[in-house]
């Protein structure tokens, strides 16, 4: 059983990731929490939590961790300073901590549009921050996967997706399906050292990831 640290565990997508991991036979989740009062929520789920702030020191959060899922984010609608602090610099801190701890894989939740943030003026600063974090991970020396979904919805997941390194189209995908993409990206050698965009589609998540991995 591999121990997985989840940053952003209290967020809408992160909670779904925790639930999937908690029902898995292969993974044991550890939720990264910012406030002590958040611990009870995970204790009720019989999930362990570790206190750590992405705007502070996170090196202690890697003890016993095999792999990491970064699903944290300011949401794109917070102030620019918060976006930079969490989505960019917070991600970098966790990447550094993971590298120092010799973590085996780092799975990043990113976003479509990071290849050219200037194309989306409303989210340009957010996408620039995500791009900075993505590039930092690519150059970190860690094994990684970067998942770049389209617009996230709270619809029930259909477990059917469309993925490619570049999809050349816009669209939506449920948080449920994104959470499964993040968890399935933990498996080796699936999507190792790859970035891919994701939308709702016609293929099962597993077959889509196997196909893009060229296995």
Segments predicted by a language model, with ranges:
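N-terminal Rossmann NAD(P)H-binding glycine-rich loop of SDR-like oxidoreductase domains
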Residues: 1-27
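NAD(P)H-binding glycine-rich loop region in Rossmannoid oxidoreductase-like domains
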Residues: 5, 31-100, 186-187
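Conserved Rossmann-fold NAD(P)-dependent oxidoreductase catalytic core, especially the SDR/UDP-sugar
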Residues: 7, 12, 30-32, 36, ...
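Non-catalytic, hydrophobic alpha-helical segments
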Residues: 13, 68, 147, 178-182, ...
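Short acidic/polar active-site loop segments enriched in Thr and Asp
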Residues: 27, 66, 104
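Conserved SDR Rossmann-fold cofactor-binding beta-strand/turn motif
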Residues: 33, 148-153
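Active-site beta-alpha turn of Rossmann-fold NAD(P)-dependent dehydrogenases/reductases
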Residues: 72, 107-110, 150, 199
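Active-site-lining helix/loop region of Rossmann-like oxidoreductase modules
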Residues: 154-157, 161-215
């Amino acid at each position: 059983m591999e121990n997985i640290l989840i940053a952003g565990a209290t967020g809408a997508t992160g909670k779904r990731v925790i639930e999937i991991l908690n029902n898995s036979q292969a993974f044991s989740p550890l939720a990264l929490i910012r406030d002590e009062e958040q611990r009870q929520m995970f204790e009720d789920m019989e999930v362990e939590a570790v206190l750590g702030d992405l705007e502070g020191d996170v090196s202690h959060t890697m003890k016993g961790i095999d792999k990491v899922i970064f699903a944290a984010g300011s949401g794109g609608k917070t102030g620019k300073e918060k976006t930079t602090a969490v989505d960019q610099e917070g991600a970098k801190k966790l990447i550094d901590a993971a590298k120092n701890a010799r973590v085996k894989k780092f799975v990043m939740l990113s976003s479509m549009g990071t290849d050219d943030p200037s194309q989306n003026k409303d989210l340009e600063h957010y996408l620039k921050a995500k791009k900075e974090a993505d590039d930092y991970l690519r150059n970190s020396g860690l094994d990684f996967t970067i998942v770049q979904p389209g617009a996230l919805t709270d619809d029930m997941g259909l477990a059917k997706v469309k993925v490619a390194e570049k999809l050349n189209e816009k669209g939506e995908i449920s948080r449920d399906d994104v959470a499964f993409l993040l968890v399935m990206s933990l498996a080796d050698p699936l999507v190792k050292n790859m970035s891919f965009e994701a939308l709702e589609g016609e293929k099962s998540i597993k077959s889509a990831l196997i196909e893009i991995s060229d296995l």
